[in-house]
Amino acid sequence: MKIYLLGAANPETIRMIRAIQRSTPNAEFPGYHDNDPKKKNSDFYGFPVLGGLEMVGGLASSDVGFVNLITGSTRARYETSRQIVAAGGQLANFIHPSIDLTMTSIGVGNYLQEAVVIQAEVEIGDNTSMHMAAIIGYESQIGSSVFIAHAVSVSGSCTIGDGTFVGTNATILPRVKIGNWATIGAGAVVTKDVPDYAVVVGNPGRIIKFIEMPFVDGKVS
């Protein structure tokens, strides 16, 4: 399958491409797409930047997948992936080959960096991103269009709803349920359930406000 990557910004994706190609020699990565017109026809660490989302429809086929690399905003990631699917593109997983996914369930369009740990009986939806050294404890359920930042620790039997953003080094204690489109601040320690749209910071985590979002869920297809 040919895999096109959307978002020519993070050089770590180049190392992931090389790792995937070492483990799967027939994996093809023709280049990147980026909506910044200044990047069109430029070079990103040896890979061409071909254009923006407008090219998806012309490239879409059964043997072509698209990877959304947007991670800074779960809302932007959700909307961009919806546009890819609406244009006829199919989302592909971009997962570092060192990650053990046995005894887990994972959807499509997910982006998991090196050193992510996914324990047994974890379920992950679609269009979710996890950065380096995040740990997802056993029997946890992670929704769609979720972002898990570097060094986040999600304990066993937790639930994280669609569209939720979990900041760097946050800790989610066992059996905690976090709703949809919530925001967990960097370094927060979440000790109890969090409702939809809540913003949580501190240790122990406390709700400081709510942000209304116009989405029921984070599903993209």
Question: For the regions a protein language model found, what residue spans apply to each?
Answer:
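Glycine-rich adenosine-cofactor-binding loop
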Residues: 1-19
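Short hydrophobic segments within beta-strands
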Residues: 5-7, 33, 69
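NAD(P)-binding Rossmann-fold cofactor-contacting core
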Residues: 26-43
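Structural signal for interior beta-strand "rungs" in well-ordered beta-sheet cores
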Residues: 94-201, 205-208
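…primarily DNA-binding HTH/wHTH and HhH modules…
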Residues: 201-221
